[in-house]
């Protein structure tokens, strides 16, 4: 049955049967064991089903159209003058809604009598823009009615009750609920701008070991580094918790070396890399999660100047520029994946000054030279995602490209040489460094104009420790582990291994 219907008697929708309504009044009772289709073929919300008697749900389905936004959003609606009982599944199709913060919610079902019936969304939630809507009972004078609300009902996924037997209740004072997908978009844009970011010692290890054959002429060398890292971050007022694992491979080599005054040294080289990251965002307010994936490449140039080529003390300046391109994906439970790309340039200028702080002998014939090296670095991060519209109609625009990251720190290390290594060119250099890192922008995503941003990463403290070693005149190795800590639960831990071969 379909169309505008007025009936004075009762109506029973049997299993396997459907009642399609536009503006319908049932003078008696309605039992639903099949499907009551509220949404019209044209898709425009506004249909009303009025039941003058009682409504009984026999595990039937009701479908509604709604333009999901604030409290006054257009929607299909059922008005029951009598009582409700039984269980009913509800499907809501969003028709052009961009999402918004609700107060009381969008009224879907109005009940005049005893409201003992239970209504639950078939998918648990419905999404629009950055917001997640649930179906919940009202409070106070509206406690009999059912609303679509983007407010948190106070229940976490870990202890979510059966919505049929324990229906949630709308609290107008509760905070809004954001989609977990927001955390995945944020993680991807942050990774696109930082995966290939590095420092001079990340790329070449200890400069004292650079060009160990330069006394015999201009040396050639190739280097490679591997990085693995794990990041934890939060977004959306702390309700979205993201963990991400990454891998980076970079390699390169010098194109040219020269001196301008027989004391300094210039290096010009090329480099390229591959990286990927997989993130998982879990909401503490809704029971589904989101996965983010990014993988891509970079290629570019680097240039380095050392004031004192003989022992690499004094000042140094290092710079690099990379073009980066990535493929991105965001997917979530029972929702279609969103694939998009990102492109852009990252560039850095780093400077420091190395001075010898002292020399002492160890107990077993080791000669140790202590160095201190203050450092400063500015990195411009210009990788941008392509603005696009998801299949569900949500407009996606990420923010944070153009971030300027500033690093100030100090590194101290010991250059150790044991007397049994005389004539073997073998040296080891343990070190520790501490840094303060500032980001000028917050990585964020706008979903239909609503911004959700990463938290706790504007200012970071970092500690690194590692060892650098010259195995022989041809081979150098280096490795380190480091931890960055921010506020609001932000942390990043990584390990790196590098190798360079000269000939």
Question: Where is each model-derived feature located?
Answer:
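Outer membrane beta-barrel transmembrane domains
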Residues: 300, 375, 382, 391-503
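Structured binding elements
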Residues: 386
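Short secondary-structure subsegments characteristic of cysteine-rich extracellular domains
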Residues: 99-115, 238-257, 395-403
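Extended hydrophobic secondary-structure segments that form protein cores and membrane-embedded regions
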Residues: 107-109, 222-223, 267-274, 317-321, ...
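Outer membrane beta-barrel translocator domains of Type V secretion systems
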Residues: 163-363, 480-482, 487-494, 500
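Primarily extracellular Gram-negative trimeric autotransporter adhesin
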Residues: 2-10, 18-29, 53-55, 143-203, ...
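Extracellular beta-solenoid/beta-roll
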Residues: 1-83, 87, 93-94, 98-152, ...
């Amino acid at each position: 049955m379909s169309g505008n219907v007025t009936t004075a008697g009762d109506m029973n929708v049997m299993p396997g049967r459907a009642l399609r309504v536009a503006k319908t009044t049932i003078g008696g009772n309605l039992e639903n064991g099949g499907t009551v289709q509220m949404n019209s073929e044209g898709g425009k919300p506004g249909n009303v089903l009025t039941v003058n008697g009682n409504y009984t749900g026999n595990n039937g389905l009701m479908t509604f159209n709604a333009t999901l936004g604030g409290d006054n959003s257009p929607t299909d609606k059922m008005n029951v003058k009598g009582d409700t009982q039984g269980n009913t599944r509800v499907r809501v199709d969003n028709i052009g809604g961009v999402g918004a913060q609700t107060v009381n919610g969008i009224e879907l079902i109005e009940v005049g009598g005893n409201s003992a019936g239970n209504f639950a969304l078939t998918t648990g939630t419905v999404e629009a823009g950055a917001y997640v809507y649930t179906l919940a009972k009202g409070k106070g004078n509206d406690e009999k009615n059912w609303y679509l609300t983007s407010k948190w009902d106070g229940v976490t996924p870990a202890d979510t009750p059966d919505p049929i037997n324990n229906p949630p209740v709308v609290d107008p004072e509760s905070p809004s609920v954001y989609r977990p997908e927001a955390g995945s978009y944020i993680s991807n844009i942050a990774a696109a701008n930082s995966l290939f970011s590095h420092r001079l010692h990340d790329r070449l290890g200890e400069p004292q070991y650079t060009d160990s054959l330069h006394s015999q002429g201009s040396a050639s060398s190739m280097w490679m580094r591997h990085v693995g890292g794990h990041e934890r971050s939060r977004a959306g007022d702390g309700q979205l918790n993201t963990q991400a694992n990454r891998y980076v491979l970079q390699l390169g080599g010098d194109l040219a070396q020269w001196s301008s005054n027989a004391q300094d040294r210039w290096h010009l080289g090329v480099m390229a890399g591959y990286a990927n990251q997989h993130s998982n965002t879990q909401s503490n307010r809704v029971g589904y999660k989101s996965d983010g994936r990014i993988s891509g490449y970079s290629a570019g140039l680097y240039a380095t100047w050392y004031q004192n080529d003989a022992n690499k003390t004094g000042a140094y300046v290092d710079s690099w520029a990379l073009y980066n391109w990535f493929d991105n994906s965001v997917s979530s439970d029972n929702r279609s994946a969103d694939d998009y790309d990102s492109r852009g340039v990252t560039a850095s200028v780093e400077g420091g000054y190395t001075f010898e702080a002292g020399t002492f002998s160890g107990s077993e014939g080791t000669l140790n030279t202590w160095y201190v090296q203050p450092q400063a670095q500015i990195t411009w991060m210009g990788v941008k995602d392509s603005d696009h519209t998801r299949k569900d109609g949500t407009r996606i625009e990420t923010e944070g490209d153009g971030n300027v990251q500033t690093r100030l720190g100090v590194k101290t290390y010991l250059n150790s040489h044991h007397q049994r290594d005389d004539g073997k060119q073998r040296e080891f250099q343990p070190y520790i460094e501490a840094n303060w890192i500032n980001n000028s922008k917050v990585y964020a995503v706008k979903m239909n104009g609503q911004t959700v941003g990463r938290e706790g990463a504007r200012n970071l403290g970092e500690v690194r420790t590692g060892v650098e070693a010259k195995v022989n005149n041809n081979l150098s190795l280096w490795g380190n582990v480091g931890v960055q800590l921010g506020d609001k639960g932000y942390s990043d831990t990584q390990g790196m291994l590098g190798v360079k071969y000269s000939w």
